[in-house]
Amino acid sequence: MFHIALYEPEIAPNTGNIIRLIANNGCQLHLIEPLGFDLEDKKLRRAGLDYADLANVSHHKNFESFLKAMQGKRIMACTTKGSRPHSELTFQQDDVLLFGPESRGLPADIIDSIPTEQRLRIPMMSTSRSLNLSNAVAIISYEAWRQLDYSGT
């Protein structure tokens, strides 16, 4: 299956929703520290309901340790600054979908380190800034899973 990575997530309920999501689609979640909340946060647990035991979650102390763990995998920067719509990419089994923090998105240096053709965006109205993080993760991860014929079901 593929991987979902959250770079310095800030809002516990969003991460909780994503934990519930990955329990349902079989992805592995990577949380890249620092986190903007405590993992024991009530809002995180409430949003994730009882899915935490079904979810595969890894923690990384920083971006460098995350990159080391993902060595050899294709990383997609999921950003409003993406060069192409997410639906134009042909996803592969071990791809990594990397999302930035809610208030600021991925830093420019991280975006710049990823090949242009691997910088994905979700099409939206020109008057909008962004989508909610957990919604964006759902949209892109389910498109990737669809392309992989819902493997694992």
Curated annotation (Swiss-Prot):
Any one Pfam family match given in the protein's UniProt record, by short name: SpoU_methylase
Entries under InterPro entries matching the protein: Alpha/beta_knot_MTases (IPR029028), SpoU_MeTrfase (IPR001537), TrmL (IPR016914), tRNA_m1G_MTases_N (IPR029026)
Intracellular or extracellular location(s): Cytoplasm
Biological process per Gene Ontology, one example term: wobble position cytosine ribose methylation
EC number: 2.1.1.207
Domain of life from the UniProt record: Bacteria
MF (Gene Ontology): RNA binding; tRNA (5-carboxymethylaminomethyluridine(34)-2'-O)-methyltransferase activity; tRNA (cytidine(34)-2'-O)-methyltransferase activity
Broad EC category: transferase
Annotated residues for binding of S-adenosyl-L-methionine: 100, 122, 130
Protein keywords: Cytoplasm, Methyltransferase, S-adenosyl-L-methionine, Transferase, tRNA processing
Cellular component, GO annotation: cytoplasm
Reaction catalysis annotation: cytidine(34) in tRNA + S-adenosyl-L-methionine = 2'-O-methylcytidine(34) in tRNA + S-adenosyl-L-homocysteine + H(+); 5-carboxymethylaminomethyluridine(34) in tRNA(Leu) + S-adenosyl-L-methionine = 5-carboxymethylaminomethyl-2'-O-methyluridine(34) in tRNA(Leu) + S-adenosyl-L-homocysteine + H(+)
Function summary: Methylates the ribose at the nucleotide 34 wobble position in the two leucyl isoacceptors tRNA(Leu)(CmAA) and tRNA(Leu)(cmnm5UmAA). Catalyzes the methyl transfer from S-adenosyl-L-methionine to the 2'-OH of the wobble nucleotide.
HAMAP family in the record: tRNA_methyltr_TrmL
Protein family (similarity comment): Belongs to the class IV-like SAM-binding methyltransferase superfamily. RNA methyltransferase TrmH family. TrmL subfamily.
Subunit structure: Homodimer.
Full protein name: tRNA (cytidine(34)-2'-O)-methyltransferase
Organism: Shewanella piezotolerans (strain WP3 / JCM 13877)
Gene behind this protein: trmL
